[in-house]
Amino acid sequence: MKTDRRYDLDWLRVGGVFLVILFHSLMIFILEPWALVYIKDSTYIYPFKAISNFIHLFNMPLLFIIAGMSVNLSLKSRTTGQYLKDRFQKLLLPATFGCIILNPIMTYIYQLSINNTTGFGEYIIGFFTKNPGDLSGIEGCFTPAHLWFLIFLFVYSLLSLPLFTKVSQTKNNVAKKNISDLLAKPFVLIVTVIPILLAAAINILDDKNPLVYFVMFLLGYFLMTSDHYRLALNRDKWGYLAIGGICSFLGVYFGNLFEEWSGMWIMIQIATQIARITIVFALLGMGNSYFNKASKSLKFLSNSSFTIYMIHFLINTGVGYIVIQCPLNPLLKFTIILALTLILSFLFYIIIKPIPLLRTVFGIK
Protein backbone atom coordinates (compact mmCIF):
# COMPACT_ATOMS: atom_id res chain seq x y z
CA MET A 1 0.00 0.00 0.00
CA LYS A 2 1.47 3.33 -1.09
CA THR A 3 1.30 6.20 1.40
CA ASP A 4 1.74 9.92 0.86
CA ARG A 5 5.11 10.98 2.22
CA ARG A 6 5.08 13.53 5.01
CA TYR A 7 7.96 15.78 4.01
CA ASP A 8 7.34 17.96 7.04
CA LEU A 9 8.31 15.04 9.28
CA ASP A 10 11.54 14.65 7.31
CA TRP A 11 12.34 18.34 7.82
CA LEU A 12 11.57 18.15 11.53
CA ARG A 13 13.70 15.01 11.92
CA VAL A 14 16.62 16.72 10.19
CA GLY A 15 16.16 19.75 12.44
CA GLY A 16 16.04 17.50 15.50
CA VAL A 17 19.35 15.85 14.57
CA PHE A 18 20.96 19.27 14.06
CA LEU A 19 19.75 20.33 17.51
CA VAL A 20 21.34 17.21 19.02
CA ILE A 21 24.68 18.25 17.48
CA LEU A 22 24.20 21.83 18.70
CA PHE A 23 23.30 20.51 22.16
CA HIS A 24 26.44 18.38 22.44
CA SER A 25 28.59 21.29 21.26
CA LEU A 26 27.05 23.62 23.84
CA MET A 27 27.62 21.08 26.62
CA ILE A 28 31.39 21.21 26.10
CA PHE A 29 31.27 24.68 27.66
CA ILE A 30 28.95 23.80 30.58
CA LEU A 31 31.17 22.63 33.42
CA GLU A 32 28.57 21.19 35.77
CA PRO A 33 28.75 17.40 36.33
CA TRP A 34 25.29 16.72 34.90
CA ALA A 35 26.35 18.16 31.54
CA LEU A 36 27.60 14.80 30.28
CA VAL A 37 29.82 14.96 27.22
CA TYR A 38 33.25 13.42 26.77
CA ILE A 39 35.29 16.57 26.39
CA LYS A 40 35.19 19.81 28.40
CA ASP A 41 36.67 23.26 27.91
CA SER A 42 38.02 25.10 30.95
CA THR A 43 35.68 28.08 30.42
CA TYR A 44 32.04 28.03 31.51
CA ILE A 45 29.84 29.96 29.05
CA TYR A 46 26.85 30.50 31.32
CA PRO A 47 24.20 31.45 28.68
CA PHE A 48 24.80 28.05 27.08
CA LYS A 49 23.18 26.40 30.11
CA ALA A 50 19.80 28.05 29.47
CA ILE A 51 20.02 27.36 25.73
CA SER A 52 20.90 23.70 26.23
CA ASN A 53 18.18 23.26 28.87
CA PHE A 54 15.61 24.66 26.44
CA ILE A 55 16.74 22.39 23.60
CA HIS A 56 16.77 19.40 25.93
CA LEU A 57 13.21 20.19 26.98
CA PHE A 58 11.62 19.35 23.63
CA ASN A 59 14.14 17.88 21.19
CA MET A 60 14.13 14.21 22.22
CA PRO A 61 10.32 14.28 22.69
CA LEU A 62 10.12 15.63 19.13
CA LEU A 63 12.30 12.81 17.77
CA PHE A 64 10.38 10.10 19.64
CA ILE A 65 6.99 11.44 18.55
CA ILE A 66 8.15 11.67 14.94
CA ALA A 67 9.45 8.10 15.24
CA GLY A 68 6.01 6.93 16.35
CA MET A 69 4.36 8.80 13.48
CA SER A 70 6.82 7.25 11.03
CA VAL A 71 6.05 3.76 12.36
CA ASN A 72 2.38 4.35 11.57
CA LEU A 73 3.28 5.18 7.97
CA SER A 74 5.74 2.29 7.78
CA LEU A 75 3.20 -0.32 8.88
CA LYS A 76 0.81 0.83 6.16
CA SER A 77 3.31 -0.13 3.45
CA ARG A 78 4.98 -3.19 5.03
CA THR A 79 3.99 -6.60 6.30
CA THR A 80 4.76 -7.44 9.92
CA GLY A 81 7.75 -9.51 8.81
CA GLN A 82 9.11 -6.70 6.64
CA TYR A 83 8.65 -4.24 9.48
CA LEU A 84 10.52 -6.41 11.97
CA LYS A 85 13.35 -7.01 9.51
CA ASP A 86 13.59 -3.26 8.95
CA ARG A 87 13.75 -2.60 12.71
CA PHE A 88 16.56 -5.11 13.16
CA GLN A 89 18.54 -3.73 10.21
CA LYS A 90 17.94 -0.02 10.80
CA LEU A 91 18.03 0.12 14.61
CA LEU A 92 19.51 -2.90 16.37
CA LEU A 93 22.41 -3.54 13.98
CA PRO A 94 23.63 0.10 13.87
CA ALA A 95 23.19 0.49 17.64
CA THR A 96 25.18 -2.69 18.29
CA PHE A 97 27.94 -1.62 15.90
CA GLY A 98 28.12 1.84 17.44
CA CYS A 99 28.27 0.55 21.00
CA ILE A 100 31.07 -1.91 20.15
CA ILE A 101 33.16 0.18 17.74
CA LEU A 102 32.38 3.91 18.05
CA ASN A 103 31.72 4.42 21.74
CA PRO A 104 34.97 2.90 23.06
CA ILE A 105 36.94 5.29 20.83
CA MET A 106 34.89 8.27 21.98
CA THR A 107 35.23 7.51 25.67
CA TYR A 108 38.95 6.80 25.24
CA ILE A 109 39.35 10.36 23.97
CA TYR A 110 37.84 11.47 27.27
CA GLN A 111 40.45 9.44 29.15
CA LEU A 112 43.18 11.16 27.12
CA SER A 113 41.69 14.55 27.99
CA ILE A 114 42.08 13.81 31.72
CA ASN A 115 45.64 12.55 31.19
CA ASN A 116 44.87 8.87 31.69
CA THR A 117 47.84 7.06 30.12
CA THR A 118 46.18 3.64 29.83
CA GLY A 119 46.90 2.10 26.43
CA PHE A 120 43.98 1.68 24.03
CA GLY A 121 44.19 -2.12 24.07
CA GLU A 122 43.99 -2.27 27.84
CA TYR A 123 41.25 0.35 27.82
CA ILE A 124 39.11 -1.68 25.38
CA ILE A 125 39.28 -4.71 27.67
CA GLY A 126 38.14 -2.60 30.62
CA PHE A 127 35.38 -1.01 28.55
CA PHE A 128 33.69 -4.38 28.11
CA THR A 129 34.60 -6.02 31.44
CA LYS A 130 34.24 -3.32 34.11
CA ASN A 131 31.00 -2.82 36.00
CA PRO A 132 29.09 -0.36 33.75
CA GLY A 133 27.72 1.50 36.78
CA ASP A 134 25.50 4.36 35.64
CA LEU A 135 26.25 3.65 31.95
CA SER A 136 27.82 7.09 31.50
CA GLY A 137 31.17 5.64 30.40
CA ILE A 138 33.05 8.26 32.40
CA GLU A 139 34.89 5.61 34.41
CA GLY A 140 36.09 3.82 31.29
CA CYS A 141 33.31 1.23 31.23
CA PHE A 142 30.58 0.36 28.77
CA THR A 143 28.15 3.06 27.68
CA PRO A 144 25.52 3.27 24.94
CA ALA A 145 26.19 7.04 24.91
CA HIS A 146 23.84 8.78 22.46
CA LEU A 147 22.84 5.45 20.90
CA TRP A 148 20.39 4.90 23.75
CA PHE A 149 17.90 6.57 21.40
CA LEU A 150 18.22 3.76 18.83
CA ILE A 151 18.05 1.08 21.52
CA PHE A 152 14.88 2.59 23.00
CA LEU A 153 13.29 2.82 19.54
CA PHE A 154 14.07 -0.81 18.80
CA VAL A 155 12.53 -2.00 22.07
CA TYR A 156 9.49 0.26 21.62
CA SER A 157 9.00 -1.03 18.08
CA LEU A 158 8.76 -4.61 19.35
CA LEU A 159 6.66 -3.89 22.44
CA SER A 160 4.12 -1.77 20.59
CA LEU A 161 3.67 -3.98 17.52
CA PRO A 162 0.75 -6.07 18.89
CA LEU A 163 -1.09 -2.89 19.90
CA PHE A 164 -0.42 -1.16 16.58
CA THR A 165 -1.52 -4.25 14.66
CA LYS A 166 -4.77 -4.37 16.62
CA VAL A 167 -5.44 -0.68 16.04
CA SER A 168 -4.73 -0.93 12.31
CA GLN A 169 -7.15 -3.87 11.98
CA THR A 170 -9.97 -1.93 13.64
CA LYS A 171 -12.02 -0.36 10.84
CA ASN A 172 -14.75 2.26 11.17
CA ASN A 173 -14.66 2.07 14.94
CA VAL A 174 -17.22 4.47 16.40
CA ALA A 175 -15.28 4.85 19.66
CA LYS A 176 -12.10 5.71 17.76
CA LYS A 177 -13.97 8.33 15.74
CA ASN A 178 -15.53 9.84 18.86
CA ILE A 179 -12.12 10.05 20.55
CA SER A 180 -10.54 11.72 17.52
CA ASP A 181 -13.46 14.16 17.26
CA LEU A 182 -13.02 15.09 20.94
CA LEU A 183 -9.23 15.39 20.93
CA ALA A 184 -9.31 17.46 17.75
CA LYS A 185 -11.26 20.24 19.47
CA PRO A 186 -9.18 23.38 20.19
CA PHE A 187 -6.29 22.60 22.55
CA VAL A 188 -7.86 19.39 23.89
CA LEU A 189 -4.80 17.42 22.74
CA ILE A 190 -3.01 18.95 25.71
CA VAL A 191 -4.68 16.27 27.89
CA THR A 192 -2.15 13.80 26.43
CA VAL A 193 0.28 15.25 28.96
CA ILE A 194 -1.52 13.25 31.69
CA PRO A 195 -0.04 9.82 30.82
CA ILE A 196 3.34 11.52 30.36
CA LEU A 197 3.09 12.98 33.87
CA LEU A 198 2.18 9.58 35.29
CA ALA A 199 5.16 8.00 33.54
CA ALA A 200 7.47 10.78 34.72
CA ALA A 201 6.41 10.18 38.33
CA ILE A 202 8.18 6.80 38.10
CA ASN A 203 11.79 7.96 38.14
CA ILE A 204 13.82 5.60 35.93
CA LEU A 205 17.12 6.71 34.34
CA ASP A 206 16.42 10.38 35.11
CA ASP A 207 16.11 12.38 31.87
CA LYS A 208 16.19 9.17 29.79
CA ASN A 209 13.08 7.78 31.43
CA PRO A 210 12.02 4.93 29.11
CA LEU A 211 8.40 5.10 30.27
CA VAL A 212 8.08 8.77 29.36
CA TYR A 213 9.56 8.28 25.91
CA PHE A 214 7.47 5.17 25.30
CA VAL A 215 4.32 7.20 25.96
CA MET A 216 5.59 9.85 23.52
CA PHE A 217 6.36 7.18 20.91
CA LEU A 218 2.82 5.80 21.29
CA LEU A 219 1.42 9.33 21.09
CA GLY A 220 3.22 9.86 17.80
CA TYR A 221 1.64 6.72 16.36
CA PHE A 222 -1.87 7.71 17.43
CA LEU A 223 -1.48 11.24 16.04
CA MET A 224 -1.36 9.56 12.63
CA THR A 225 -4.52 7.49 13.09
CA SER A 226 -6.80 10.36 12.12
CA ASP A 227 -6.31 13.39 9.89
CA HIS A 228 -8.31 15.35 12.47
CA TYR A 229 -5.17 15.54 14.60
CA ARG A 230 -3.06 17.01 11.81
CA LEU A 231 -5.68 19.66 11.12
CA ALA A 232 -6.00 20.43 14.83
CA LEU A 233 -2.24 20.91 15.23
CA ASN A 234 -2.17 23.18 12.18
CA ARG A 235 -5.01 25.26 13.60
CA ASP A 236 -3.70 25.52 17.17
CA LYS A 237 0.06 25.76 16.52
CA TRP A 238 0.52 29.35 17.67
CA GLY A 239 -1.48 28.78 20.83
CA TYR A 240 0.59 25.71 21.64
CA LEU A 241 3.73 27.73 21.00
CA ALA A 242 2.60 30.40 23.47
CA ILE A 243 1.73 27.81 26.11
CA GLY A 244 5.02 26.01 25.53
CA GLY A 245 6.99 29.23 25.76
CA ILE A 246 5.48 30.21 29.11
CA CYS A 247 5.79 26.72 30.60
CA SER A 248 9.35 26.25 29.31
CA PHE A 249 10.38 29.52 30.97
CA LEU A 250 9.01 28.20 34.25
CA GLY A 251 10.69 24.83 33.80
CA VAL A 252 14.10 26.12 32.69
CA TYR A 253 14.46 28.96 35.20
CA PHE A 254 12.65 27.61 38.26
CA GLY A 255 13.04 23.84 37.90
CA ASN A 256 15.77 23.46 40.54
CA LEU A 257 14.71 26.13 43.02
CA PHE A 258 12.27 24.10 45.10
CA GLU A 259 12.55 21.08 47.35
CA GLU A 260 11.73 17.82 45.59
CA TRP A 261 8.07 16.78 45.92
CA SER A 262 7.10 20.12 47.48
CA GLY A 263 3.95 21.73 46.11
CA MET A 264 5.84 24.24 43.97
CA TRP A 265 8.23 21.57 42.71
CA ILE A 266 5.28 19.46 41.52
CA MET A 267 3.73 22.46 39.77
CA ILE A 268 7.01 23.20 37.98
CA GLN A 269 7.29 19.54 36.90
CA ILE A 270 3.79 19.70 35.47
CA ALA A 271 4.66 22.93 33.64
CA THR A 272 7.83 21.31 32.29
CA GLN A 273 5.97 18.32 30.84
CA ILE A 274 3.32 20.62 29.36
CA ALA A 275 6.13 22.63 27.76
CA ARG A 276 7.70 19.51 26.26
CA ILE A 277 4.52 18.35 24.60
CA THR A 278 3.10 21.72 23.52
CA ILE A 279 6.33 22.85 21.88
CA VAL A 280 6.35 19.60 19.90
CA PHE A 281 2.70 20.16 18.94
CA ALA A 282 3.59 23.69 17.78
CA LEU A 283 6.51 22.38 15.70
CA LEU A 284 4.35 19.66 14.14
CA GLY A 285 1.72 22.24 13.24
CA MET A 286 4.23 24.69 11.79
CA GLY A 287 6.05 21.93 9.95
CA ASN A 288 2.91 20.64 8.26
CA SER A 289 1.70 24.16 7.47
CA TYR A 290 4.92 25.47 5.95
CA PHE A 291 7.41 22.67 5.24
CA ASN A 292 5.47 19.78 3.75
CA LYS A 293 7.41 20.09 0.50
CA ALA A 294 9.95 17.91 -1.26
CA SER A 295 13.34 19.24 -2.35
CA LYS A 296 16.72 17.89 -3.45
CA SER A 297 18.35 19.24 -0.31
CA LEU A 298 15.73 17.54 1.88
CA LYS A 299 16.35 14.20 0.18
CA PHE A 300 20.08 14.44 0.92
CA LEU A 301 19.59 15.70 4.47
CA SER A 302 16.93 13.13 5.28
CA ASN A 303 18.94 10.21 3.89
CA SER A 304 22.06 11.28 5.79
CA SER A 305 20.44 12.24 9.12
CA PHE A 306 20.53 8.75 10.67
CA THR A 307 24.21 8.23 9.88
CA ILE A 308 25.07 11.73 11.06
CA TYR A 309 23.24 11.09 14.33
CA MET A 310 25.34 7.95 14.81
CA ILE A 311 28.76 9.45 14.01
CA HIS A 312 28.45 13.07 15.13
CA PHE A 313 29.21 12.48 18.82
CA LEU A 314 32.52 10.76 18.11
CA ILE A 315 33.50 13.50 15.66
CA ASN A 316 32.33 16.19 18.08
CA THR A 317 34.45 14.67 20.85
CA GLY A 318 37.53 14.29 18.65
CA VAL A 319 37.28 17.80 17.23
CA GLY A 320 36.58 19.21 20.69
CA TYR A 321 39.64 17.45 22.14
CA ILE A 322 41.86 19.29 19.65
CA VAL A 323 40.11 22.67 19.60
CA ILE A 324 39.84 23.21 23.36
CA GLN A 325 43.63 23.04 23.59
CA CYS A 326 43.99 26.02 21.24
CA PRO A 327 44.45 29.52 22.77
CA LEU A 328 41.24 30.91 21.28
CA ASN A 329 38.20 32.82 22.47
CA PRO A 330 35.68 30.30 23.92
CA LEU A 331 32.92 31.45 21.57
CA LEU A 332 35.25 30.97 18.61
CA LYS A 333 36.13 27.50 19.91
CA PHE A 334 32.43 26.66 20.09
CA THR A 335 31.82 27.91 16.55
CA ILE A 336 34.74 25.90 15.18
CA ILE A 337 33.66 22.73 17.01
CA LEU A 338 30.07 23.01 15.77
CA ALA A 339 31.07 23.82 12.19
CA LEU A 340 33.69 21.08 11.93
CA THR A 341 31.37 18.52 13.50
CA LEU A 342 28.74 19.25 10.85
CA ILE A 343 31.20 19.34 7.94
CA LEU A 344 33.08 16.18 8.93
CA SER A 345 29.85 14.30 9.68
CA PHE A 346 28.52 15.05 6.20
CA LEU A 347 31.87 14.13 4.64
CA PHE A 348 31.85 10.86 6.54
CA TYR A 349 28.38 10.07 5.17
CA ILE A 350 29.43 10.89 1.60
CA ILE A 351 32.58 8.75 1.89
CA ILE A 352 30.92 5.63 3.32
CA LYS A 353 27.72 5.78 1.26
CA PRO A 354 29.14 3.74 -1.68
CA ILE A 355 30.61 1.04 0.62
CA PRO A 356 28.02 -1.76 1.12
CA LEU A 357 29.23 -3.01 4.51
CA LEU A 358 29.45 0.48 6.01
CA ARG A 359 26.08 1.41 4.51
CA THR A 360 24.60 -1.49 6.41
CA VAL A 361 26.12 -0.82 9.83
CA PHE A 362 25.38 2.92 9.61
CA GLY A 363 21.74 2.39 8.62
CA ILE A 364 21.93 3.99 5.18
CA LYS A 365 18.94 3.17 2.98
Where are these regions (language model features)?
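Membrane-cytosol interface segments of multi-pass membrane proteins
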Residues: 1-209, 299, 325-365
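Functional transmembrane helices that form membrane-embedded active or gating regions
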Residues: 4-16, 85, 89, 233-245, ...
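Hydrophobic residues within membrane-embedded alpha-helical segments of Major Facilitator Superfamily
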Residues: 19-22, 62-64, 216, 223, ...
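Interfacial loop-to-helix transition and helix-capping segments at the boundaries
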Residues: 48-61, 138-152, 198-217, 232-240, ...
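Transmembrane alpha-helical segments
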Residues: 67, 155, 159, 163, ...
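Hydrophobic, small-residue-rich membrane helices and short re-entrant helix-turn-helix hairpins
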Residues: 79-85, 224-235
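Alpha-helical transmembrane segments of multi-pass integral membrane proteins
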Residues: 98, 244-355
